[in-house]
Every structure is written in C-alpha cells, then in structure tokens.
Amino acid sequence: MTKTALVTGASRGIGLETVRRFIFNSEDITTVVMFARDSQDFRDAIEELKETIPLGRKIVPRFVDVGDREALAQAVTEVHAEVGRIHVVVNNAGYTNPVPLQQVDMEDFEKTIEVNLYGPFTVVQTLLNSGNVFELIVNIASTAGINGRSGWLTYSASKAAVINMSQVMREELAIYGTRVVCLSPGRTATALRRTLAPDEDPSTIMQPEHVAKVIETFASPVGRFIDSENIVVRQ
C-alpha cells in the first residue's frame, strides 16, 4: 500500500529533513506534500529533490503561509482533492520572536499563535471535514512548552497549547485508528533556534536530521507501537 504524507514548514530544518527521510527511506510513503512560504530556500529544496527523487516517488510542493488560516485551509482542501487520502501529517511550521514580557507586542503574539497553534489545528480540522482518515498526526511542540523560559513567553505558551491540543486530538481521533504523537525536541540547530539563541554554537546541539529520524520511526511499521501524548527528544 502506498501512502501520502503532508509536511508543513518544509523549506528547511526539521521539515525538509523529514521530507527527505520519507522520500528516500520510507517503505510505503511515496508522495510527500510540502507546505512552506515562498522563499529561495524552498525553491532550492524543491529543485534539489526533483533532481534526486527515486523512481515512483513524488513531491507536491505548495507555497502557503501557515499563519494565514484562510489560505492554509484552501491549500489543504485543494491538495486533498488532488492527491486523495493523506495518511500522515507532520505539523512542523513554527514562528518565534523572543522578547521580554514588557515588550511583547500583541500583533506578534497573535502571529505566534496563528502559526504554531492555529496552523496545525487548521490542517487537521480541514482534512477531517473533507472526509480524510489519518493514520498518524505528528505535532511538533518543544521542551519550551513544558518548561517556560525567560524571554520566550509567546513561543512557550503556543507550544504548551500544542501539547495540550495533541492530547485532545489523540483522545478524539482514536476511534478512527489515528495515532497522534506530540514531539517536543530540545535544542536543535534550526533557523528558529538561531532566533531564540543567536550566540549558541549549532554544532554542539541536536541536528534537524536527528529529529527527522525520530519522525520517520513514528511513520514506519514499528511506529504503530508508539502511542504517547508527548515525546521529548534531546541531546
């Protein structure tokens, strides 16, 4: 049986590495839908994958801002009509702008919630309302959602909500045979991490491909034995 996966935030970092793991290593995922904002990084990633993709596999890239709920819902509906059932969703797209409590701007707070919380919710709800039955939903949270950190109020709050939302999704969707896994990576060398900790040496922390390997395991045959509300991975 061939399967289709959808990965948000697929232009770089954990998202792009997850796409690569699915396309090149998965036993049964043959189609990967890639959502990301229009950027040179995303265009370069698309070209690289098209040049190296194995026979019988394909990518379906879409330029979409996960923080724009209306555009996101439309993109999800259109791609579902095009590719059919989406078996695996990896809600990876994220945003942060770390500032002290006194300097938090409400517009920026709302943007953080839009991308980090409403984005995953919109993807899942839109597909459910289109009749899609998932095998696996992976919501990427963060250890910052477990233990809030100074200066990371908006990001930590949004990721804490993702952890809780994942618990509810897990309970509600179990009747359909859907597994919902929330993954909370620790320090990972991504663009978002550089925003949170600009002075940190990225070579000393976990790499995106390490997290992607964990996600690949969730989607593999052995992954059906993994059913947890929140899994922490850290180096």
Regions found by a protein language model. Name each.
Residues 129, 170-172:
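Alpha-helical segment proximal to the catalytic Tyr-Lys
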Residues 124, 158:
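Active-site helix of classical SDR
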Residues 100-101, 108-110:
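Substrate-binding pocket helix/loop in short-chain dehydrogenase/reductase
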Residues 11-12:
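Conserved glycine-rich cofactor-binding loop
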Residues 142:
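Residue(s) in the substrate-gating loop at a strand-loop-helix junction
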Residues 27-44:
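Conserved glycine-rich Rossmann-like NAD(P)H-binding loop of the short-chain dehydrogenase/reductase
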Residues 175, 182-183, 190, 200-235:
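C-terminal helical subdomain
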